């Protein structure tokens, strides 16, 4: 993180989220996890996707900072680009695909947390394997 990003004490963080997201090379990296929410940055390579999914008990807000793509939200497809934001309520089927020539970069807030605290996966395959084997479970209580 650059000089604008710092820790302020007991799990209190300050960062310029768009810069952190742009600098992230990983498919998915957890930046911060609290009791009720989690901040994650993602970089989707050209032709890649997050993957069709439903979070039964977790709301998700995604903000796109670079690239272009498509959002599939409950059976409807919409174009997305830098500056767009999507709010996905718990129980909604969704997927986000990179349809451009550059990485699709975003940050997302989950409430409650969806992934293991401090998890980082360089590729979608690594992230999927961690989920399949139970190594990407969110903290409890």
Task: Place the predicted regions along the sequence by residue.
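A short hydrophobic beta-strand segment most commonly corresponding to one strand
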Residues: 61, 87, 102-117
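Short, conserved beta-strand element in jelly-roll/cupin
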Residues: 43-45, 54-71, 109
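Short, charged/polar surface micro-motifs in flexible loops or helix N-caps
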Residues: 35-37, 45-49, 68-70, 77, ...
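Conserved short histidine dyad/triad with adjacent acidic residue
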Residues: 22-26, 40-55
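A short, N-terminal "cap"/entry segment at the start of jelly-roll beta-barrel domains
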Residues: 1-36, 121-141
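Short beta-strand His + acidic residue motifs that chelate non-heme Fe in jelly-roll/DSBH
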Residues: 52, 71-72, 88, 94-100
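A generic "binding-loop/recognition-motif" signal
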Residues: 37, 46, 57, 76, ...
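Short acidic-glycine-tyrosine-enriched beta hairpin
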Residues: 76-90
């Amino acid at each position: 993180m650059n000089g604008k990003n710092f820790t302020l004490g007991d799990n209190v963080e300050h960062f310029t989220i768009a810069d952190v997201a742009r600098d992230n090379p990983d498919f998915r990296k957890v930046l911060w996890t609290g009791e009720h929410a989690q901040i994650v940055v993602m970089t989707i390579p050209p032709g890649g996707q997050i993957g069709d999914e439903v979070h039964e008990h977790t709301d998700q807000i995604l903000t796109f900072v670079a690239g272009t793509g498509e959002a599939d939200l409950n059976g409807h497809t919409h174009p997305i680009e830098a500056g767009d934001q999507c709010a996905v309520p718990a129980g909604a089927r969704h997927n986000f695909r990179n349809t451009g020539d550059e990485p699709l970069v975003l940050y997302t807030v989950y409430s409650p947390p969806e992934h293991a605290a401090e998890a980082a996966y360089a590729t979608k395959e690594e992230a999927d394997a961690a989920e399949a084997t139970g190594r990407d479970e969110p903290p409890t209580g």
